[in-house]
Design a protein with these regions (language model features):
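C-terminal interaction modules
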Residues: 1-24, 46-49, 73, 81, ...
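Structural recognition of beta-strand segments within beta-rich domains
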Residues: 29-179
Length: 233
């Protein structure tokens, strides 16, 4: 029997498993509420269902009349309203149930953010106009073209523009409004919010509930061969 006949399949299998290794991704949370069209955006757009993993460095988008809630590994709850886009820029684990560093970019749409068990300094939330630092916080965040609104529901937060103009939110209802007009960015503070996430909560059952993360410790999603077999199994 020609030795090459036996060696080639083995070498090919090794190469196929090694090549996608970079594609293996870390599970950092899971979807607990999915209403209508919710997708992850990468090289291809794929739908997300309840129970699906939330992966490090991924972008999530909701469609019109759609909503979603994700629970991260540290029990942070992220709720998205219709036509929202969220990017997990960075997640660095401290241990299996907390983060040392997590950066979340809320590009467009309406969101509710409830902190989990990580140190509050670990969280960095950004919109195109603002950077938000949290301290034991429930926040409603609206990101629109030329305008961001940050409403404190509980805890405290610091909201800064990209030019380091900052306001401190310390009382429920405290609101930072950041606007960009003609290239000039300004920030104001009020205790009369022009908007909150409450209407989204009322429209979608479970969207604004708060759950602890029930999954196992963060796991690596193995690369899968074309025949559906897991490499290394």
């Amino acid at each position: 029997m020609n030795l090459r006949f036996w060696l080639f399949p083995a070498l090919l299998s090794t190469a196929l498993c090694a090549a996608p290794a970079a594609l293996a991704q870390t599970r950092v949370g899971e979807a607990v509420v999915i209403q209508n069209e919710v997708v992850r955006v990468a090289a291809a757009t794929t739908p997300i269902s309840v129970g699906d993993s939330m992966l490090r460095d991924e972008t999530v988008r909701t469609g019109a009349d759609s909503a979603a809630r994700f629970v991260m590994a540290d029990s942070t709850n992220l709720s998205l309203g219709p036509s929202a886009t969220l990017k997990l820029d960075r997640t660095v684990f401290n241990d299996e149930h907390s983060y040392r560093d997590v950066a979340i970019r809320m590009t467009t749409g309406a969101f509710r953010f409830v902190t989990g068990h990580s140190e509050k300094t670990a969280y960095k939330i950004t919109t195109p106009l603002a950077t938000i630092g949290v301290r034991g916080t429930t926040l409603d965040i609206l990101s629109q073209r030329g305008r961001s609104v940050v409403v404190l529901q509980d805890g405290a937060a610091s909201v800064c523009t990209t030019s380091s103009q900052c306001v401190q939110l310390t009382q429920p209802g405290d609101t930072a409004i950041i606007t960009s007009t003609g290239g000039k960015v300004s920030i104001t503070k009020t205790n009369t919010p022009p908007w909150t996430f409450a209407a989204n909560c009322a429209a979608s059952a479970g969207l604004c509930a708060v759950n602890q993360y029930a999954g196992a410790s963060p796991t690596i999603t193995p690369a899968v061969q074309d025949d559906g077999m897991l490499c290394g199994r």
